[in-house]
Regions:
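Oxidoreductase and adenylate-handling cofactor-binding alpha/beta cores
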Residues: 137-145
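Rossmann-fold NAD(P)-binding glycine/threonine-rich loop
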Residues: 81, 87, 92, 101-125
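Short glycine-/small-residue-rich Rossmann-like dinucleotide-binding loops
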Residues: 75-76
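Rossmann-fold NAD(P) dinucleotide-binding segment
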Residues: 60-70, 79-101
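Short acidic-hydrophobic, aromatic-tinged amphipathic segments that line or gate anion-handling sites
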Residues: 55-59
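NAD(P)-binding Rossmann-fold cofactor-contacting core
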Residues: 23-49
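General beta-strand structural signal in soluble alpha/beta enzymes
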Residues: 98-99, 128-132
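Glycine-rich adenosine-cofactor-binding loop
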Residues: 4-17
């Protein structure tokens, strides 16, 4: 059984993640973005790979109702801004991984919000992991230059 993923945010980071996930045979089942010119476009074509038949949606409820193991969130960094998105994903019984820097060690920066997210995740039997994107520049320095 392959891992099923929803992409939340279709900027540069999640377009890169889309390419990497597809290279590894991961099944992307949905894509969410804010209203704008990307809505309705195919995630694969927008990410520079083959057509995936995954239209980008501005309807999180609809996309989060799909069967998926994890939502990869790459929208913005600040936990107070991201809290409603994380909460929505967790309440949809989806595991969450985010590159938001303030989520990489949120216990120190935003203890109250972190406790609340932790409690929500536990209540729904899912997890939330903040990785941060701090290593991105170093890891890809050779490519970027």
């Amino acid at each position: 059984m392959t891992t099923k993923v929803i992409m939340y945010g279709v900027g540069q980071m999640n377009m890169l993640a889309t390419r990497l996930l597809k290279e590894r045979g991961i099944d992307i089942v949905g894509a969410i973005n804010r209203p704008g010119p990307k809505i309705g476009k195919d995630l694969g074509l927008l990410s520079g790979i083959d057509y995936l038949n995954i239209p980008i949606s501005d309807n999180p409820e609809k996309v989060l109702s799909k069967t998926a193991d994890i939502v990869i969130v790459a929208v913005t960094s600040e936990l107070p801004i991201m809290f409603p998105i994380y909460k929505q994903c967790l309440e949809a019984k989806k595991n969450v991984a985010t590159i938001g820097e303030s989520s990489s060690f949120s216990w120190r920066l935003y203890p109250e919000l972190t406790v609340e997210l932790d409690n929500i995740a536990k209540a729904y039997g899912v997890t939330i992991t903040g990785t941060g994107a701090q290593d991105f520049g170093i890891v890809h320095l050779g490519i970027l230059m």
